[in-house]
Amino acid sequence: MKYIGAHVSAAGGLANAPARAAEIGATAFALFTKNQRQWRAAPLTPQVIDDFKIACEKYLFSAAQILPHDSYLINLGHPVSEALEKSRDAFLDEMQRCEQLGLTLLNFHPGSHLMQIAQEDCLARIAESINIALAQTEGVTAVIENTAGQGSNLGFEFEQLAAIIDGVEDKSRVGVCIDTCHAFAAGYDLRTPEACEKTFAEFGKIVGFQYLRGMHLNDAKSAFGSRVDRHHSLGEGNIGHDAFRWIMQDGRFDGIPLILETINPDIWAEEIAWLKAQQIAEAVA
């Protein structure tokens, strides 16, 4: 079964996120558990935690259907010790917030070397950052998102994701989220079913589908292999509809959150309905 949704707002309280997801016909959703542009946030109160759990139950969202995202400020591979510690503390707080809310996944961008340390050293720092957070939490999987490779961001090659996973001690609590726009911009072709087969065969060989814990379904304004991160609405960008139809009709993408971060929230309901229809088309066929 496919879990399909979007990254919804938690404005006005975390309990509003499941309701907003339900309004657009979603069977999955992503959210920020705090302001993503601030380092610190007030601790979650028992009331906030209870309200969120009740709302998830009301709208039939289990933890397996929810893919929270951490702050954009965090850089788990930061080359400067003080900044690295600040990021590690913030990441631990994000993991602990998920644990308190009964969530089992936390999606994050791996990190950047900022042209100051070697790529291998940065990847090792990211893995160690994950180890530190996992050692102080229970039940939450750290989900590494592939990047477009913009600037000095790492995680744009499957080999880099595999290297981070290799450095994580508890393999049962690390996974990846593949963003289709990022993959395309990083040079993984998705424009035809044949290209999708090739790209995900490579993913399976290098990373492994056992680590796939979520996806971001985004078309790309950016050009193939451009290393530029620019999302677009499904079918409107340079990837086109075929990739998303192919994903909907492949069982390897069942049982994980498939999250839209497309640029027009006004048509998320339509995009979700279209994705669901592709799945039904497969069943009929």
From Swiss-Prot:
Cofactor binding notes: Binds 3 Zn(2+) ions.
EC number of the protein: 3.1.21.2
PROSITE patterns recorded: AP_NUCLEASE_F2_1 (PS00729), AP_NUCLEASE_F2_2 (PS00730), AP_NUCLEASE_F2_3 (PS00731), AP_NUCLEASE_F2_4 (PS51432)
Keywords: DNA damage, DNA repair, Endonuclease, Hydrolase, Metal-binding, Nuclease, Zinc
Residues that hold Zn(2+) 2 according to the record: 145, 179, 216, 261
Positions bound to Zn(2+) 1: 69, 109, 145
GO biological process terms held by the UniProt record: base-excision repair
UniProt cofactor(s): Zn(2+)
Chain residues that bind Zn(2+) 3: 182, 229, 231
GO molecular function: deoxyribonuclease IV (phage-T4-induced) activity; DNA binding; DNA-(apurinic or apyrimidinic site) endonuclease activity; phosphoric diester hydrolase activity; zinc ion binding
Reaction(s) this enzyme catalyzes, per UniProt: Endonucleolytic cleavage to 5'-phosphooligonucleotide end-products
Keyword Calcium: no
InterPro entries: AP_endonuc_2 (IPR001719), AP_endonuc_F2_Zn_BS (IPR018246), Xyl_isomerase-like_sf (IPR036237), Xyl_isomerase-like_TIM-brl (IPR013022)
Record-linked NCBIfam families: nfo, PRK01060.1-4
HAMAP family for this protein: Nfo (MF_00152)
Role noted for this protein: Endonuclease IV plays a role in DNA repair. It cleaves phosphodiester bonds at apurinic or apyrimidinic (AP) sites, generating a 3'-hydroxyl group and a 5'-terminal sugar phosphate.
Similarity field: Belongs to the AP endonuclease 2 family.
UniProt protein name: Probable endonuclease 4
Organism listed in the record: Salmonella newport (strain SL254)
